[in-house]
Structures are given as C-alpha cells and as structure tokens.
C-alpha cells in the first residue's frame, strides 16, 4: 500500500467551479449566481485528500489510495475541481461507515432581554456614596432600571450544510442572534424561546460546547506568538482521535496547518508574529484571516461568523466566502454569518438571508427572493446597488427609495416592517418549511450519528461526556509549549527581568557583604534573609497585569472548547518552575556567598529551594487575586494590603511574642513567615556568635576588667558566663520557633503554593469577568435614550435628515495641493532590509476624493503612515510637498488621520472626546460655542447623537460603545478638527452599508467644500465607489498598478485594464471588484500581466510625472498669511488646562482606582496601627516604632505599583493624541502628575488618622504631629511621581514591573534601617546613601517620633547580669558605669537587691538615632530635600514623556 508524504501546497484562485445548491427539496436554500473554482495542483492532491479524509473521520487508507490512483489521469489538468475533490472524499467517509456531523439549527420565538440604558449610569466618585445613602431610603429598594428586547420573537432555521446570512444595521441585534445560536447566553437579563441543534435542546447542547462557535468581530490573539505557533497550538487542542490508521498526530497537524494557510493566503506570514495595535506584526487583514483560520481549526459543526470580513479587501473576502461555501456543501458544515457591506458575489453564495431591524425579524427566506420581497413592499433599488445594501437600506428613510404609487403605503418603522413580514405569504411558507424540517429531524435523528461522531473524535483518555476533544494532559502540554513561546517571543522583557535580578543580586551582596559572625551580625543576618524574601515578592507584582491581559483570549478559546481554563493555570505553573529556578539561582549564587552565609552545599540548596517556594507561592497569590477580581485596580489595592500584612507578620519586624491576638492569626496563614522561619533555621541552626568585645558588663575604655564568669552577651539566647550565643537558641527566644522545624516549615510553604494553585484553578473555571463578549452602554445620569422605541426612531431619523440638509451651510474648508514623489520605505528585517513601498507617487487636490486600494498587505496603511508623517521606524525616501512647499512643522496639526485602530480614552463620553478634539485642534480664534455647535453637527451626521452622553468604555470589560461605534467616533474626532487634508485608513471597515454610505457621502461633501483627501477602502460597493474621483492602486510590495482618474461610470479606469487584455467590465459589475480581480488580488489571486511593470511603461505614468512637476512649480493658486506655522493650534497654557480637566474627569469616573487608593491607605493604616497597638516607652517598643515607620516606607513603595497601569494606559492615549498634535508633551506630563496630588494627600491623611493614634505615636507637641503628616504626604508624592517616571520610560507594563524592583532596592536597603549607616560599605555610603530620598524621609520622621520618647525597659527588655560586688555594697550603676560610646542605663532588677542587675540599651529615643548619625535638628532640612527629590521626579516624568512621545511604528 502506498504511503503518502506531506508536501507544501497552496490553493489557486477560486473561480470557474460550478456550485450547485444542496438538494433540500424545498424552495429555501437556493443559491443565486453560480461561480467556479480552480483546484490546487494535482501533484499535491494526495495530501489534500488525506486532509479531507481526516476531517471526515476516515480510517480507510487503502480506499483513499485507490481513490487517488483514479484521479492520477488529471495530473496535468489545471481545471481539477476542488468541489469534486471534496465530494470524492465525502464518499470515502461514507464508504467506511462514517457520517459527517450534520447539525442544523431551528430557532423559535427567540426573545433576548437586555439591560436598559437607564439601569446603570456612568460610575464616579459619588456613586458609592449615593448607593450607601440609598440603603437608608426604603423607597429606592425596589427601584430597578428598565429592560428592552435586544431580539424580539425571532423564528428562523438553517439546515445542516446550509449558509445563512444575517443582515442588519449596527445595533439591530445581529451579533446577539449569532451569540445565542452558538449557545453563548451569559450577560443577558433573560432569554426566552427555543433553539434546537439537530433536535438537541440548547440546555443539553451545552455538553457539546465547541460544536457551535461564535467568531467575534475583534481579533484577539497573543501578540508575541507567530502565526505558526498560534495555529499549531489550536491544532494540538483539537486533534481528533479517529485519524487514519498509523497516522501520527504531528503529520495530521501539519497537513491541516498547510491546507488552512494555503486556503487563506498567509503561507508567507507563517513565522511572522501576530502583533497588535502596539506591537508591529501582521497587517489588519492578515490578522483577520488568522482569526478565521483559528475558528476553522475548531472544526465545529455550526460556526457563527460576526463581521469576519472586516479588514479584508473585496477579493479576499470573496475567496473566504467561497471556501466557506464549499466546506458547507461537501462537509455539511452549518454556517451563519453576519457581514457588513457584503457584495452581491458574496451574497449569492448564501442559501438564505435574515434581515433584522431593531431586534425584529423583517425577512427570512431564500436570498434570491429577498430583493423582490422588498420591491413588492414598495421600495426601489438603484442601479449597481448591491442586494445586501438594498436590504439594509430600506429601513432608513434617508437611503430608501419609494416606488412611484407607493407613497404613504410602505412600512416606516421597525414595527411596521415586522408586521408586514408576519402578514406575508412568505412568512407562512417559512413556518411550514420549518415544521417540515423539524419533522424530518424527528424521523432521521441526526443527533444519534452526531453524538457517536463526537465521541469518536475524543482521545482515549478524555471522558465521552467532556466538551473537549483532547485530554486534560494534552491540553496542559500544548499550553506549556505555548507559554514558553509567548515568553520567548518577548525577549526584551525576559532579558530585562533576568538582568535586573542579576544586577540587584550584586547590590544586595555588596551591602550585606561578608556578614559578621559576632553578636553584631545577629539581627543584620536576620534582616538579610527577610529582605531577600521581600525582594522576590516585589518581583512577582508583574503577574497581576499579565493575568488580566490574557482574559479575552482565554474566554474565546474556552468557548471553542480548546482547553479547560484550569489547564492554562497548570501550564503556567509548569512554566513558572524553570523560570523561577533560573531567577532564584541567578540571585542566590551571588548573594549567598557575598553575604558570607554558611559555605555548605546542602544549606545553599535549601536556601534556593525555600526562595523558589516563596516566589512560586507569591506569584500564585498575585494571580489568585487577579482571577478573583473584576478590575486590575481592585486586585492591585487588595494585594498591596495583603503584602503589607504579610511583610508585617513575617515574624521579623514584629516577633511572634509581640503580636496582638486580633491579627496574630495572619502569622500562621502567611507563606512569608514559613519561608522566613525556614531560612533562619537553615542559617542559624548550627552557628554560634561571639560577643567577647561587647558582652555586658564591659568597659569601652579598657580600664575596668570584668570577670567573664559574670558577663553575658546582650542578646536573646545568651547565658551567664558564656560569651557565645547559639543561633538555634537565639531564634527560639527571639522569634519563638525551633531550628528543628526547618523541614516542616518548607513543607508548609509549598502547601500554601498548592493551595493557591487550587484556588486559582477554581477561580478560572467558575469566574468569567469578560462578559462573554456582550457589551452594554452606560450614560450620564438622565441622558439614556429609549431603546428600540418607535418614537425615538422617528426622532433620530429626523435629526439625520436635518443634518444632511444643512451640511452645505456648515462646511467651509481650506485645503491645498498635496503631492508626493518617489516614496520608498524600507524596514530592517532579519538578515537585511525589506522594501514596503516602491517609488510611489501621486497627489490630492482640493475638491477631489482619491481612493487608495489594493489587496491586504499591499502597503496601503504603510503609505498613509508615511504621507501623514506617522512613521518613526524604518527609512523613508522621497519628497512630499504641500502647495509646492516642503512640509512644515504644522503639517500633522492641519491634517486629519483616521487610523485603522480605534484608540480612544475609555473614561470619556463620546461628546467629551469630540469636544476635546475641537477645542484643541480648531483655530483658537473660533468661538467655543461655534466649536461645540460643529461637534453637535458631526454627531448628527455620524448618527451618534443618541450616543453623545455614552461612555466610550472598553471592549474587554463589556461596558461601552460597540466596535462599529468606535470606528465612527474615530472618524468624528478627526472631522471636528476641520483639517485641511484628510487621510482615512479604512474608514468604512466594520460599518454597515448605510453608515458607510453616510460617511463616504459626508467626506464627499468635505471634498466638495475644498478639502483634499485620500481614503483606503477595502470593500467599496458600486455606489460608494462612484463618489471617488481618482484611485491609487497598489500591488503587493507597495508597487503602483495605477494612479489616475476613475472617470464617469469608471470608464477611464476600466478601459486602462481592458487595453492590456483584461475582459470588459459589465454594466452590472462592481468596478472595484473588477480591478482587484484583474490585478490578481485576493488570497490566491494571480495575473498573467505584471501590472507594476506595465504601469512604469504606460503613457499615463509619463503624464502623471509631468503634472507632478507642474503642480510643484505652480504652488497654491492663492495664499493666505496665517503667520508663522504653529505645531499646535492652541497655546501651551490652554492645552495644560484642558488636559488637566480631562484627566480629572477620567480619575473622577474611576472609583476603583481612586477609592482603591483611599481604602488601601486606610486599611494599611488600621492594620499597622492595631498591629503596633499603643506602643509604650520600653526598649522593644522603641524598636517597634522604628519598624512601624519602616513599613510606612514599604506602603509608599507599593503605591508605585498602583500608578503604573494607569500612567502607561494614559501615555498610550497621549501618544495617539500627540501624533495628531492635539497637545504637546508638557501639558500631559504636568497634568498627569498634578491629577494624582489630591488623591495622594487624601490617601496619606487617611493613613495618618488610622495609624498615628492607634500605634500610640501621638504626642502633646503639635509641631511633631504636623511634621509626621507633612513629611508622610511628601514621601507618598515622591513615590507616586517615581512610579510615573519609571512608567514614562518603559515600553510596557511588564517592563515597568521589572525595572521597579531594581530601583526599589536602592530605596529601602540604603535608608538606614535595614543596614545602619556605619555598616554600609564605603562605596555605597559615599553616594547612594546620601542620594537616597528614603534616607531623608526616615531620618526626618524617626527623629521626629523619637525625639521626646523616654525609654523605660521592662524585665524582658533588660539584659540580666550578676553583680558579684553587691556584697561589698557596690550598686549596679557603680559596678557597670555607662561611658561613651555605650548608651542606655543600668539598674537593679528588683528594688533593694543590687546583686541582680539589668542593662537597658537606651535611655531615650535620641540616643537611638544618634547612633545612626541622625539629628532632630535636620528635620526641616530633610523635608526640603524630599521636596527637591519630588520636583526632580516631576522633571524626569516630563523628560521621559518627551523622549517617548512618539509611538514606535
């Protein structure tokens, strides 16, 4: 038997294959126009046959070989039919007794109830207050907002193997219908009605998750993975069990991988990273194809595609639809799709069409009958208008055309259309057809075969009731590989992390270098071990944003039934282990031996093993809070409270005996405490510490010699007459644990890690914070419109009509002639450079609209980036002129650029975003009222008047405006600026036909008013294409195919191609699709003509070059003197005010962030205050005061992590605004610093009042109390500004989290507490200690608190020793007189008994801080220095914002 080998292959362009309608024996499911398709090369047919056989669960390799032999006579036949190929493969499956999973869908009386717009308003800082007050108002307890029907009484069906096209304007409920059909029911108030899948009810269908999938409009992928890695992972998770006999999984995956990449034309991008809006990778169209390919890998029986052609050019979209058609026909795959701007070529591929308006079904039936249905209602279709555009346009009064004689008789509102449909004969026929289909289902019972096939696909170790194809172990393995690939794909962050750790290890090692083995090194050695735990804990902070960043991808892939969410966490654990081991080893190999810890291999590895456990536990603790929290800020603040508690109750700053009962339980629930005990036991267990020179009593001047028999070490664990202290005795008496418990403590530490793993798995399985892809809008209070209301619809239609009628009166543009010549753009790639634009030239004039077209990846967006001066990477060559002059500093300001990615600040409303653009970008001479009036006009024209007071929000949280509405807002933001030149990158992508028509008509008016503009457009209908005057057509590689006039009826354009042998363009054909087909655009398009070379030799190019030279020489026809060109429209002071006002609004509307800071400070204050409850005047209490202040230091450091995500997010929005010259870098930098000041002051005040009195720090000296509060506020301001400065220079949040610990080391290690100043190595003490702001904070606040503190030791605080001279009448003070440099005092333990003496280390607090070289007199100097450091941080923020002001693109 012949063995097949896998070779690479690709599909040819889809054409010339007759597609027949599936024989359903009814009048539904009729395909309109036939189309044809060329096959792949016959030499690769063996591989493709095997793929199909696998997809159909064929296990007959012999039969497949025979079938291949039968087809060998076609080897040189280029017309080998792909359809025939699929049909033959289907026969292979049937011949082996297997059947495809044939599952149709039947929907009856489906009603979906959503949250009304008035049910929730935009949250702000007043919202929680009013909610609390409402608890005391019984009248509000039963108040509920309104609901509305997103879908109302929908009844339709789609047979197995059928293709249903769902049409409707944005907001009509198309996406909701697709979600419900794919059985995604979360986030809706109520779902009524029935949906059955081949007779299986929706409730039972949950067991077959992954057999009906929803592919969302947005593209969500890991940006650092390549295409190959993304799809290979999906294939590993969806590899079926019933493959061909003896076929390896790897071979199976590779065959499908090659097939799908060939089908969608991304073979050459296989090793390109996916990228996103911030990371360069695939183009938008290529990323969309990857999304479709990933969905196909799932091999679902029912697939719902939501606007999946967004970003694809017309030819690629058609190729994609044809592939879907063939798979539906031959493999009985059921497809439901919702497309915006579908061409007739795509429309005709579908069996049935459903038209939805405002949640009402207004037509369902055969696609070839829909147009006539609406014509019979009284509507007329314009020539060359596509059928989908006509079907969605009839509901819009501004677009529809009423046939003569039907005036006043046609439906006007969505309710009228629904009533007309329900009264039609087609509706009754549809109901009968649905009943007949359901009877057929009852007879044939396709669910039986379906269930058997689903079970057969599952691996042997997968439960037959599981929704997953592969086993849990297989999922984990695939996820482990993917996790490593993700990490390796971001080498910068990985390298930065390890470099940071390695660098910090030397800092740690040098400051604690060669620790003393005498009694002076006892406490320092413990502090060293405590600090290494703290350092590794802070490194784990980066896990929090990573947890939130992967939620969208997890939700999508889980809906595809690729893997269990808990499997992802197990894979993360496996990934963590080697990375953590490397991190800990790099740190430990340096610090362990530089510290001078015990040179014992066993102890070194226990040290490493314990640190690994502590790091793993902390990492999973951070993830746990992320998985249990809906918001990053909530989890960040809660986690910071826990970190402070964990540090406090580690057992070092406050030993176990000093803990109060109300919080002491946390000591036992704290993994840090077990790690600390393990490290201490490991190091101290068999060490002894000498105190020969420091034993009590002693004479520093060496005059008095004491008998060693009566001397004792001044340390816990000491015994009379023994001048050494046992390490094990020391830790037992100081910290109340035994060194023998080392193994137990390590074991418990790892048990905490396991517990956090279990809790994470539980949270990931049962908590979904993404909203399931469903989003809802929130409005300002009282501004919510009525949803799906007839009167509201009429009102909105009238607004649009009025706006259209007064457009000419409003638009007054001032444009110029913009030319570009010989534009070349190259980017560095591995092994050299890549040319993306090749000698592109052209112009745009006032009054002209130029279309920029080409297949996906041809360089359209790249050209616009170059022309709009947005490129900051690569090399640009060529010349650009405006009115014959080189471009000046104001070019970006006077041009508008509608970018492909919709980047908006989520904390603003739609109206606020537009007004902000108008205020800062229109000329300052324009009155504010006029600017706002123009904003309202644009809102009306963009059909967004009802959205004016809606929060923009984010798609990830499910709160905010939709994808389509964001696109309209992107356009509106540029239009309100009244630019002189307008660049638009796919302005109609993702919009429905009517919205696209309105936008194109609007920019046509702009052009007619004198604005020159160029617009990339992927899928223009004939009607849209007619609005353009000229076209620049690009081929792959950025080569020019044509630049010139389109001509009336596109005759000038089409005649150019006809002149070189292309077939004539018919009257009914879309010219845009015609030229793309002619030039070989699309997934597998090709052309026999080298059009770029043809253009170079054409007379049209020579004429273009002559005119370009004339235009550059001519210059402007008239000039206006507007003074010196200005980079920004408004002065800096005005920009600063407006930016500050905007940030204030955003902060005001983010209670999670703002109140989170307040709560974090308050809770930290209460925890610390009650932990160090009512400190007295004992020696140990004085030490507790110092540690209380030290933990205040840590609070400020943790605040740094809170500001990171907010600053980095706002900086991304700033970069987008700066590129369009909204405002300069200085207003942003100074405003984002200023907006944090009141939050810091309030937070610090809360902390002060919650901790100062509870800890017993209050004194009768008001100046001291005030000073504590003042320097605390300054320190917190320093920390926040420090975090902002680091954020400003970081490329992403992960890098910022990596840099922060490196810098924090210098702050808390050199503050004078962890290591006293005299013990800091000379190298560091000479500069770092004096440049450390925390040193001045600690000196100022410690001297302030301890200045008036008198120390009175308790019996436990005294170092007890015997006075042998007591019998001779010598008192304790006489026996041991205190002389410098010793501090403290001596007294009898029991009054009247001078034989038992006690030594107290300090007399007062001043003696303590004098040993550190600190002075109370320096407190105001320290405060002034801290102010200087804060100002320095602000200058660094400003500097770094300036350096990074331009995005990398």
From Swiss-Prot:
Source superkingdom: Eukaryota
- Biological process GO terms, please? aggregation involved in sorocarp development; sorocarp morphogenesis
Query: Which CDD domains does the entry mention?
Result: ABCG_PDR_domain1, ABCG_PDR_domain2
Q: Which UniProt keywords apply?
A: ATP-binding, Membrane, Nucleotide-binding, Repeat, Transmembrane, Transmembrane helix, Transport
One GO cellular component term of this record is: membrane
Subcellular localization(s) per the UniProt record: Membrane
Q: Which InterPro entries match?
A: AAA+_ATPase, ABC2_TM, ABC_trans_N, ABC_transporter-like_ATP-bd, ABCG_dom, ABCG_PDR_1, ABCG_PDR_2, P-loop_NTPase
- Start and end of every ABC transporter domain? 130-383, 818-1062
Keyword Transmembrane helix listed? The answer is yes
Where does the chain cross the membrane? 577-597, 602-622, 634-654, 661-681, 747-767, 1155-1175, 1188-1208, 1228-1248, 1266-1286, 1293-1313, 1423-1443
Q: Which residues form a coiled coil?
A: none
Q: Which SMART domains match?
A: AAA (SM00382)
According to its UniProt record, which protein family does this protein belong to?
Belongs to the ABC transporter superfamily. ABCG family. PDR (TC 3.A.1.205) subfamily.
Q: What protein am I looking at?
A: ABC transporter G family member 19
Q: Which gene encodes it?
A: abcG19
């Amino acid at each position: 038997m012949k063995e097949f080998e896998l070779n690479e292959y690709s599909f040819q362009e889809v054409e010339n294959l007759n597609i027949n309608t599936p024989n359903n024996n009814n009048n539904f499911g009729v395909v309109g126009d036939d189309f044809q398709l060329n096959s792949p090369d016959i030499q690769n047919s063996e591989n493709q046959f095997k793929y199909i056989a696998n997809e159909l669960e064929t296990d007959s390799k012999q039969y497949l070989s025979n079938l291949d032999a039968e087809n060998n006579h076609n080897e040189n036949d280029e017309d080998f039919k792909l359809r025939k190929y699929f049909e033959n493969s289907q026969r292979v499956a049937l011949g082996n007794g297997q059947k495809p999973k044939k599952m149709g869908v039947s929907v009856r009386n489906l009603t979906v109830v959503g949250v009304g717009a008035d049910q929730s308003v935009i949250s702000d800082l007043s919202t929680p207050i009013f909610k609390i007050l409402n608890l005391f108002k019984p009248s509000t307890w039963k108040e509920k907002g309104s609901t509305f029907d997103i879908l109302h009484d929908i009844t339709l069906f789609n047979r197995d193997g059928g293709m249903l096209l769902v049409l409707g304007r944005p907001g009509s409920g198309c996406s909701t219908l697709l979600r419900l059909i794919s059985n995604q029911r979360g986030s809706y108030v109520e779902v009524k009605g029935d949906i059955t899948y081949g007779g299986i009810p929706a409730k039972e269908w949950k067991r077959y998750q992954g057999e009906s999938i929803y592919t969302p409009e947005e593209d969500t992928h890991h940006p650092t993975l390549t295409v190959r890695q993304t799809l290979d992972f999906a294939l590993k998770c969806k590899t079926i069990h019933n493959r061909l006999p003896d076929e390896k999984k790897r071979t199976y995956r590779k065959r499908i991988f090659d097939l799908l990449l060939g089908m969608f034309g991304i073979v050459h991008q296989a090793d390109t990273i996916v990228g996103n809006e911030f990371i360069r990778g695939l183009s938008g169209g290529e990323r969309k194809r990857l999304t479709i390919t990933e969905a196909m890998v799932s091999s679902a029986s029912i697939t719902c595609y939501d606007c999946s052609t967004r970003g694809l050019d017309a030819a690629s979209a058609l190729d994609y639809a044809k592939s879907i058609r063939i798979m539906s026909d031959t493999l009985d795959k059921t497809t439901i799709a919702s497309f915006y701007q579908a061409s007739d070529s795509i429309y005709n591929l579908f069996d049935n069409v459903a038209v939805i308006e405002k949640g009402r079904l207004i037509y369902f039936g055969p696609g070839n009958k829909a147009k006539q249905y609406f014509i019979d209602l009284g509507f007329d279709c314009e020539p060359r208008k596509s059928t989908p555009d006509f079907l969605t346009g009839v509901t819009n009064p501004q677009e529809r055309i009423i046939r003569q004689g039907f005036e006043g008789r046609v439906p006007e509102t969505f309710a009228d259309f629904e009533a007309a449909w329900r009264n039609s004969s087609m509706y009754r026929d549809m109901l009968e057809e649905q009943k007949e289909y359901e009877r057929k289902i009852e007879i044939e019972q396709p669910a039986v075969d379906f269930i058997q096939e689903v079970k057969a696909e599952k691996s042997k170790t997968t439960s037959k009731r599981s929704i997953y194809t592969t086993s849990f172990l297989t999922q984990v393995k695939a996820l482990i590989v993917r996790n490593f690939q993700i990490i390796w794909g971001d080498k910068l962050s990985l390298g930065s992390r390890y470099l940071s750790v390695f660098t910090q290890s030397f800092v740690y090692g040098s400051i604690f270098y060669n620790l003393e083995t005498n009694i002076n090194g006892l406490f320092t050695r413990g502090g060293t071990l405590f600090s290494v735990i703290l350092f590794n804990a802070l490194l784990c902070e980066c896990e929090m944003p990573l947890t939130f960043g992967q939620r969208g991808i997890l939700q999508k892939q889980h809906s595809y039934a690729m893997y269990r969410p808990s499997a992802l966490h197990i894979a993360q654990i496996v990934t963590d282990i080697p990375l953590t081991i490397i991190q800990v080893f790099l740190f430990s190999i340096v610090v362990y031996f530089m510290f001078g810890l015990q040179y014992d291999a066993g102890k070194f590895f226990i040290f490493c093993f314990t640190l690994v456990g502590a790091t793993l536990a902390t990492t999973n603790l951070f993830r746990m809070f992320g998985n249990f929290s809906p918001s990053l800020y909530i989890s960040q603040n809660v986690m910071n409270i826990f970190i402070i508690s964990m540090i406090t109750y580690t057992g070092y700053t406050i030993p176990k005996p000093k803990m109060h009962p109300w919080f002491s339980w946390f000591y036992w629930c704290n993994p840090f405490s077990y790690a600390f005990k393990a490290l201490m036991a490991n190091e101290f267990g068999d060490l002894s510490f000498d105190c020969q020179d420091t034993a009590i009593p002693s004479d520093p001047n060496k005059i008095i010699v004491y008998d060693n028999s009566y001397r004792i070490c001044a340390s816990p664990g000491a015994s009379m007459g023994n001048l050494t202290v046992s390490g094990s005795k020391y830790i037992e008496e100081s910290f109340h644990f035994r060194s023998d418990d080392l193994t137990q403590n390590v074991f418990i530490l790892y048990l905490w890690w396991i517990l956090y793993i279990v809790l994470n798995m539980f949270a990931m399985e049962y908590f979904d914070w993404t909203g399931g892809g469903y989003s809802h809008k929130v409005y300002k209070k009282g501004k919510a419109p009525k949803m799906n209301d007839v009167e509201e619809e009429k009102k909105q239609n009238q607004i649009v009509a009025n706006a259209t009628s007064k457009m000419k009166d409003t638009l007054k543009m001032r444009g110029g002639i913009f030319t570009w010549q010989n534009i070349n753009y190259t980017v560095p790639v591995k092994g050299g450079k890549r040319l993306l634009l090749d000698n592109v030239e052209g112009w745009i004039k006032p009054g002209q609209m130029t279309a920029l077209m080409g297949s996906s990846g041809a360089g359209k967006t790249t050209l616009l980036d170059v022309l709009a001066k947005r490129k900051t990477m690569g090399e640009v060559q060529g010349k650009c002129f405006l009115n014959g002059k080189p471009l000046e500093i104001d070019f970006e300001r006077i041009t508008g650029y509608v970018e492909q990615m919709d980047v908006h600040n989520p904390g603003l409303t739609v109206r606020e975003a537009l007004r902000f653009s108008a205020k800062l970008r229109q000329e300052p001479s324009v009155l504010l009222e006029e600017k706002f009036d123009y904003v309202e006009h644009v809102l009306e024209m963009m059909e967004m008047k009802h959205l004016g007071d809606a929060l923009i929000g984010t798609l990830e949280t499910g709160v905010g405006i939709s994808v389509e509405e964001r696109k309209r807002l992107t356009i509106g933001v540029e239009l309100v600026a009244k630019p002189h030149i307008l660049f638009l990158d796919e302005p109609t992508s993702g919009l429905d036909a009517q919205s696209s028509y309105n936008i194109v008509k609007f920019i046509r008016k702009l052009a007619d008013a004198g604005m020159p503009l160029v617009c990339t457009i992927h899928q223009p209908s004939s009607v849209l294409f007619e609005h353009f005057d000229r076209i620049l057509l690009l081929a792959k590689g950025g080569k020019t195919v044509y630049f010139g006039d389109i001509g009336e009826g596109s005759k000038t354009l089409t005649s150019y191609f006809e002149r070189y042998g292309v077939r004539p363009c018919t009257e009914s054909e879309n010219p845009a699709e015609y030229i793309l087909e002619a030039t070989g655009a699309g997934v597998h398009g090709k052309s026999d003509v080298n059009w770029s070379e043809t253009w170079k030799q054409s007379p049209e190019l020579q004429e273009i070059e002559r005119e370009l030279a004339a235009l550059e020489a001519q210059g402007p026809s008239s000039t206006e003197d507007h003074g010196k060109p200005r980079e920004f429209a408004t002065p800096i002071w005005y920009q600063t005010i407006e930016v500050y006002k905007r940030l204030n609004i955003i902060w005001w509307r983010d209670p999670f962030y703002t109140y989170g800071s307040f709560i974090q400070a308050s809770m930290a204050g209460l925890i610390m205050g009650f932990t160090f409850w009512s400190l007295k005047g004992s020696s140990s209490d004085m030490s507790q005061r110092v540690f209380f202040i030290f933990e205040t230091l840590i609070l400020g450091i943790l605040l740094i992590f809170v500001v990171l995500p907010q600053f980095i997010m706002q900086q991304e929005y700033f970069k987008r605004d700066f590129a369009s010259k909204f405002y300069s870098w200085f207003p942003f930098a100074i405003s984002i610093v200023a907006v944090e000041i009141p939050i810091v002051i309030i937070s610090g005040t809360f902390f002060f009042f919650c901790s100062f009195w509870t800890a017993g720090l209050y004194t009768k000296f008001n100046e001291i109390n005030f000073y504590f509060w003042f320097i605390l506020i300054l320190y917190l301001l320093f920390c926040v500004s420090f975090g902002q400065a680091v954020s400003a220079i970081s490329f992403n949040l992960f890098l910022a989290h990596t840099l922060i610990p490196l810098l924090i080391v210098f702050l808390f290690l050199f503050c004078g507490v962890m290591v006293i100043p005299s013990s800091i190595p000379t190298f560091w003490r000479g500069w770092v200690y004096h440049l450390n702001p925390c040193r001045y904070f600690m000196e100022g606040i410690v001297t302030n608190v301890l200045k008036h503190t008198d120390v009175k030791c308790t019996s436990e605080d005294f170092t007890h020793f015997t006075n042998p001279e007591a019998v001779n009448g010598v008192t304790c003070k006489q026996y041991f007189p205190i002389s410098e440099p010793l501090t403290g005092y001596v007294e009898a333990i029991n009054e009247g008994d001078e034989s038992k003496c006690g030594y107290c280390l300090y007399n007062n607090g001043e003696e303590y801080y004098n040993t550190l070289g600190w002075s109370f007199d320096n407190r105001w100097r320290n405060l002034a220095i801290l102010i200087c450091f804060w100002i320095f941080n602000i200058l660094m923020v400003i500097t770094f914002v300036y350096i990074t002001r331009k995005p990398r693109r």
